Amino acid sequence: MSEQSSGRSGDLRETVRQRYAAAALRVAEGAGASCGPEPVEADDTFGSTLYAADERDTLPAEAVAASLGCGNPTAVAELREGERVLDLGSGGGIDVLLSARRVGPAGRAYGLDMTEEMLALALANAAKAGATNVEFLKGSIEAIPLPANTIDVVISNCVINLSVDKPAVFAETFRVLRPGGRVGVSDVVADDALTVEQRAERGDHVGCIAGALSFAEYRAGLEAAGFTGIEIIPTHPVADGLHSAVVRALKPDA
């Protein structure tokens, strides 16, 4: 990587960090209001409206308000009792808390985030929810701070598109999954016909648009990391030629 591109990647990562830190602080500051925190995203394409009401209503209001995703990966990951699940870019913890319920006391749900403010919010939300089978880790999704072959399921919600090194994300995801483990991700994906420049015209990087991979690029990236059984299924449009999609993949058995 050239010095110029390395600098640009660092700038993008810092922009993303600042955006999510600000979102966490807005939710935390709103928590003291009599009517509860305002959601940081509230439309039909991003945010808490993509979760079923019966799921939202049983979570801390701050976890729901901090939702910035483009789907509900816990609904498609087919989590089972006793499994160990990792959420890449866990934010305020909504998907970690939902996962913790699905895997039960014999399982464990990990959340990984690079933003101190989001981690603090997630820990507070876990305490309010009374969740004892959760753990939040500080770090980047390009260098996951967990041992190899220890996770059953990796989920993520509209975060991989924000990474400046997606091959590293796919390689690290493959590394931490046990043989036979699986991926269940919600992410923004672009039509194959859209160039990188056309994606940038439709939205910025921090808005989960400019950094989106195409369907073909996403599949190729997962295949290069060693994944099989890849499915990329669009669920709803988020911009012209860009979609929220469910991404599933398997790490082959040893």
Predicted regions and their residues:
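Conserved SAM/SAH-binding beta-strand->alpha-helix loop
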Residues: 115-117
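A short glycine-rich, Lys/Arg-flanked "PGG" loop and its adjoining helix->strand segment in the class I
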Residues: 167-182
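Short, glycine-/aromatic-enriched active-site segment of Class I SAM-dependent methyltransferases
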Residues: 190-209
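Short alpha-helix
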Residues: 210-225
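Core SAM-dependent methyltransferase catalytic element
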Residues: 225-254
